[in-house]
């Protein structure tokens, strides 16, 4: 599955351009080992109302692909958040929040806070930017 493979530049560009593709990618990584409802522990699910979400067939609780991940409560498009995470973790680029703001059309402080969140995760896992897989970042509960 995608978790075991490197994220190619082509796949990354596809994810940067479309929030639905990004949500499906995150969902595939998040539930690679199967869905387990956080409320009741049931493993059967159906597709939820939003892209990439899953709904427990027992208690009907819906969990989004971004819930309990680095992208939880992200108030801007997930594809833009994924771009920031990708450039920090995979490419190891040290891009300023002002540059992210210009590139993505977001507020500078929004970019700064999200980049800070990613860097805190990198420090938490005890790795430098070059050595941490982006999948680790995606699955980190924040």
Label every PLM stretch briefly.
Residues 1-142:
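Residue-level recognition of single "structural anchor" positions
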């Amino acid at each position: 599955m995608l978790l075991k493979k490197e994220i190619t530049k082509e796949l990354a560009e596809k994810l940067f351009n479309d929030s639905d593709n990004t949500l499906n990618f995150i969902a595939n990584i998040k539930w690679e080992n199967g869905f387990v409802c956080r409320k009741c522990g049931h493993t059967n699910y159906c597709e939820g109302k939003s892209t990439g979400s899953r709904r427990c067939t027992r208690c009907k609780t819906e969990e989004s692909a971004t819930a309990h991940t680095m992208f939880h409560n992200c108030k801007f498009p997930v594809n833009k958040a994924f771009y920031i995470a990708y450039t920090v973790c995979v490419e190891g680029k040290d891009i300023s929040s002002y540059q992210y703001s210009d590139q993505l059309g977001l507020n500078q402080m929004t970019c700064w806070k999200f980049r800070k969140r990613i860097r805190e995760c990198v420090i938490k896992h005890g790795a430098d930017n070059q050595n941490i897989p982006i999948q680790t970042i995606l699955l980190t509960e924040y």
